C-alpha cells in the first residue's frame, strides 16, 4: 500500500486520469479484479487487483476527470469494490465518438485506428488476469489499453467543443453512470423479465422465482443463469410443472439445481398467496398503440438530428420514448419523473416537441388496460 501513495497523490492532483480494468467474470456474480490500469501524468501504472485499493478508489471518486472507453463494466466493478456509487466525473470516449458520428459502439481498437491512426492488437482479451505473474504479453496489452486513451480523449474533446457537444457528452456520461449505479429492490427484480402478456398469476410466480434466484445468486456468488436461465423461467411460467419428474424431464435445468432446489422451485410456482396479493398486470406498452403517430415522432427526431448534427439514435432510444409516452399518458406533469436523458439538454429541443405530438395523439385515442 505504501507503493500506492505517490500514485494516489497524482490522481488527486491530475486534471485527467485514463482508466481501464482487466477482470474475470466467468462463474461468479461479482467480477474478480485482476489489474487496474491507470495512465496519469504521462505514466502508466498496472496495479494488482488483489491489493487493498480502498484509497485508490476514493481518489478516483474525488478526481477531476476519469476517462474510459466503454465504461459500463469498469464502473460497475468500481462500484462493487469501492462500496460507493455513482461516479460523477466520467468522460467516455465511446459516447463521444457516437456524438461525432462514428457509430454507437465503436471498439477501442477501431477508435484508435479511426482517430489516431494507431493499430493495436487485442490478443489477450480472454487471458487469465488473476494469474501471477502476468506474462509480458499481458502486461503490454494492459498498458496499451490506457496508453493512448488520453490522446484519444483530447482529440475527441477538441472536436466536441468545436461542435458545441462537449457538455452534452459529459451530461450523458453522468446519466449513464447513474444508470449503472441503480439497484432495483429485490422485490422488483422480476420487472426486468416481466411483460404485458403475463397474467397476474404468472407475474406472482415470476416475482417469487426471481427473488429466490437473486438471493441464491448472491449467497453462492454465482451468475443468475447458472441457477435458472431466463428462458427456462419463461417456460416454467408457460407450462407450470407439478412434479419433480416433470421438472427433470421437461426443462433444461441443471441436475444439481433440481436435486438441491427442485422442491422449492415447485413450491414457488404452485404455492401462491391470495390473488389479491398478485402484482397488477402490466399494461400494453403505449408505443405499440401509437403506430399512426410513429411517422410524426420519427420526423421530429430526424429534424432535430439534422438541425443539431447529432445522430438520431443518440437523440432518442426506444426505451426513453416508451417511458415518455407513458409519462404523457398518465398526465403526470412532474418533470422529475422523466428519464434523466429526457431532461437536461434534450428537453427544450426534443422532449417538449415530442410531448406535444404524443399528447395530441392521446387526446384522440381511447386506451383500455386489462388486469
Predicted regions and their residues:
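Conserved RNase H-like, two-metal-ion catalytic cores of nucleic-acid enzymes
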Residues: 1-110, 114
Amino acid at each position: 500500500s505504501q507503493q500506492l501513495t505517490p500514485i494516489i497523490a497524482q490522481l488527486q492532483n491530475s486534471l485527467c486520469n485514463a482508466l481501464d480494468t482487466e477482470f474475470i467474470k466467468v462463474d461468479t456474480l461479482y467480477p474478480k479484479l485482476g489489474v487496474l490500469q491507470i495512465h496519469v501524468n504521462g505514466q502508466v501504472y498496472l496495479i494488482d487487483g488483489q491489493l487493498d485499493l480502498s484509497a485508490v478508489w476514493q481518489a478516483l471518486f474525488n478526481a477531476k476527470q476519469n476517462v474510459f472507453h466503454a465504461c459500463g463494466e469498469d464502473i460497475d466493478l468500481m462500484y462493487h469494490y469501492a462500496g460507493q456509487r455513482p461516479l460523477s466525473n466520467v468522460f467516455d470516449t465511446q459516447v463521444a465518438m457516437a456524438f461525432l458520428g462514428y457509430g454507437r459502439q465503436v471498439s477501442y481498437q477501431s477508435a484508435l485506428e479511426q482517430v489516431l491512426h494507431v493499430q493495436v492488437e487485442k490478443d489477450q482479451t480472454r487471458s487469465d488476469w488473476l494469474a501471477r505473474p502476468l506474462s509480458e504479453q499481458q502486461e503490454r496489452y494492459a498498458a496499451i489499453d490506457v496508453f493512448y486513451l488520453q490522446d484519444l480523449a483530447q482529440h475527441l474533446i477538441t472536436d466536441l467543443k468545436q461542435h458545441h457537444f462537449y457538455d452534452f457528452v459529459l451530461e450523458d456520461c453522468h446519466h449513464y453512470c447513474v444508470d449503472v449505479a441503480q439497484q432495483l429492490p429485490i422485490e422488483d427484480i422480476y420487472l426486468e423479465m416481466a411483460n404485458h402478456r403475463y397474467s397476474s398469476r404468472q407475474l406472482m410466480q415470476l416475482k417469487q422465482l426471481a427473488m429466490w434466484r437473486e438471493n441464491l445468486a448472491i449467497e453462492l456468488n454465482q451468475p443468475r443463469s447458472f441457477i435458472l436461465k431466463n428462458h427456462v423461467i419463461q417456460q416454467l411460467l408457460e407450462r407450470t410443472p407439478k412434479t419433480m419428474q416433470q421438472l427433470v424431464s421437461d426443462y433444461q435445468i441443471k441436475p444439481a439445481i433440481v436435486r438441491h432446489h427442485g422442491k422449492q422451485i415447485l413450491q414457488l410456482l404452485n404455492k401462491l398467496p391470495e390473488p389479491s396479493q398478485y402484482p397488477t398486470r402490466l399494461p400494453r406498452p403505449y408505443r405499440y398503440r401509437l403506430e399512426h403517430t410513429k411517422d410524426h415522432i420519427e420526423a421530429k427526431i430526424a429534424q432535430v438530428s439534422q438541425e443539431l448534427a447529432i445522430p438520431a439514435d443518440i437523440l432518442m432510444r426506444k426505451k426513453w420514448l416508451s417511458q415518455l409516452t407513458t409519462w404523457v399518458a398518465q398526465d403526470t406533469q412532474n418533470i422529475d419523473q422523466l428519464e434523466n436523458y429526457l431532461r437536461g439538454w434534450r428537453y427544450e429541443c426534443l422532449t417538449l416537441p415530442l410531448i406535444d405530438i404524443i399528447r395530441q395523439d392521446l387526446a384522440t385515442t381511447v386506451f383500455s388496460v386489462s388486469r
